[in-house]
Amino acid sequence: MPRKGIIERWKRPKKFKVREYTRCSVCGRPKAVYREFGLCRVCFRKMALEGKLPGVKKASW
């Protein structure tokens, strides 16, 4: 979970609209974020394996 100060910084209005980027809603990681879920790949995998994401199934072939 990101620190309180970091969360407050995210909420502030941005100087430049172009510089906005996605962050994981759970841990705050800026890279490898799935827009549809708002989660990074690490949190997505963890939550999917725990069954917390409905409709997500592990693929095997």
Swiss-Prot record:
Recite the UniProt cofactor note for this protein.
Answer: Binds 1 zinc ion per subunit.
What keywords are assigned to this protein? Metal-binding, Ribonucleoprotein, Ribosomal protein, RNA-binding, rRNA-binding, Zinc
Instruction: Name one process (GO BP) from the record.
Output: translation
* Cited function: Binds 16S rRNA, required for the assembly of 30S particles and may also be responsible for determining the conformation of the 16S rRNA at the A site.
Please provide, alphabetically and separated by semicolons, the GO molecular function terms listed in this UniProt record: rRNA binding; structural constituent of ribosome; zinc ion binding
Q: Which gene encodes it?
A: rpsZ
Provide the assembly information: Part of the 30S ribosomal subunit. Contacts proteins S3 and S10.
Q: In which domain of life is the source organism classified?
A: Bacteria
What does UniProt give as GO cellular component?
A: cytoplasm; small ribosomal subunit
- One Pfam family from the UniProt entry? Ribosomal_S14
Identify which cofactors the protein needs according to its UniProt entry.
Answer: Zn(2+)
Q: Where, by residue number, does Zn(2+) bind?
A: 24, 27, 40, 43
Give the family per the record.
Answer: Belongs to the universal ribosomal protein uS14 family. Zinc-binding uS14 subfamily.
Disulfide bond residue pairs = none
The protein's name in its UniProt record = Small ribosomal subunit protein uS14
